[in-house]
């Protein structure tokens, strides 16, 4: 009668542990977008510029902006990639992980809720409400450049924007420790 040699359990468990480690570390290399946008309600005097921004920690794939006002939804920019775009008084600049919507001369038809659909590594939705106020004489701003320079992401900390990294590393170490402990117990049990 012929018997097949059995596959030792220890190398199998170690291979499984290494595979688990590789998969876990690969998952940790993908950072979340962590969107930061103009918050809540933006109130601007009629005729003045309005600037709304959304920034993510990764590069934008595309940006869609819709305006909801008076019970109607209107798409202003649909799935715009990197670049500068203009349409009926709205200007959109998408550069890296930063998007900026500028209205140079705000009017009543600009009032409403702006739904930002951000697409980087994930999809995220943000609402910004724009209210138009009656201007006073001192509210009028002289015409200046509205686009601000964007900060360089290369100078920011590599840990910034990745709060889950430490939790992921601790989880991987814990799983490997448990796998090692189970392997040790199994090995001792088989030898006794």
UniProtKB/Swiss-Prot annotation:
Protein's recorded name: Secreted and transmembrane protein 1A
GO molecular function, one term: cytokine activity
Native source species: Mus musculus
Superkingdom assignment: Eukaryota
GO cellular component: extracellular region; plasma membrane
Signal peptide: 1-27
Source organism phylogeny: Eukaryota, Metazoa, Chordata, Craniata, Vertebrata
Ranges that cross the membrane: 166-186
Residue numbers on the Extracellular membrane side: 28-165
């Amino acid at each position: 009668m012929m018997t097949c040699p059995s596959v030792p359990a220890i190398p199998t468990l170690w291979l499984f542990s290494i595979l688990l480690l590789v998969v876990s570390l690969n998952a940790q290399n993908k950072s979340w977008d962590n969107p930061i946008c103009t918050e809540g309600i933006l109130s601007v005097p009629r005729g003045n510029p309005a600037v709304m921004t959304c920034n993510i920690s990764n590069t934008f794939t595309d940006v869609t902006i819709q305006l909801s006002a008076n019970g109607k939804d209107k798409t202003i920019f649909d799935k715009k990639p990197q670049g500068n775009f203009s349409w009926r008084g709205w200007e959109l600049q998408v550069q890296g992980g930063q998007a900026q919507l500028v209205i140079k001369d705000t009017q009543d038809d600009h009032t409403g809720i702006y739904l930002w659909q951000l697409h980087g590594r994930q999809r995220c939705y943000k609402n910004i409400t724009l209210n138009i106020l009656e201007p006073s004489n001192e509210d009028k701003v002289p015409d200046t450049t509205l686009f601000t320079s964007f900060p360089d992401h290369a100078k920011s900390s590599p840990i910034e924007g990745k709060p889950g990294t430490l939790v992921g590393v601790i989880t991987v170490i814990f799983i490997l420790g448990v796998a090692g402990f189970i392997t040790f117990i199994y090995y001792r049990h088989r030898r006794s």
